Amino acid sequence: AMSDSIKALSTEIPATTEEIAAVAEAAGQLGIQKDALLDFTEIMTMLGTATNMTADEAATSLARFANITGMATDNYGRLGSVIVDLGNNFATTESEIVAMGTRLASAGKLAGLTEPEIMALAAAMSSVGIEAEAGGTAMTQTLNAIEKAVAKGGDDLAEFARIAGMSSEEFSSAWKNDAMSALTSFIG
């Protein structure tokens, strides 16, 4: 049963049975499917141990992020590893990365960014002191404007391309094939 699995988990990771059960309960309330519940609970509990987020905060934030991006439940482990790695390598915290990432999720997905790319962009932005609310809004507007310009062509596309040091055709192709590198060229 689930309670046996939770007890077993408490011997593998530094969390009490009660803490793990609370995360499992939250996961159920967040709509995590039963077959993914134990893995999700383990990953979120480990994030609660390895980051500045509690396991509950990690569960709520990442479930919301996954819901916005349509991420498959079997990618939680990989995304958790990405967040810990970014937190270790940027001058920002995991909770700031996730807050910014959630703000960027919808526009990032629309632009064709992967979930790890969205979190990497979030880490880069929050590490230079950009706040999630204002920065997320500004970057969302930028991503949407680029997406619209690439779809329509014309002067707006030419301006984005000029700033990125490319022709309109090059920028349009880069955006469609690797939005993150096109964005990096534009920002850089």
Language model region names:
Residues 1, 183-188:
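Short, intrinsically disordered, charge-balanced linker/junction segments flanking boundaries
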Residues 139:
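Conserved catalytic-loop aspartate of Hanks-type protein kinases
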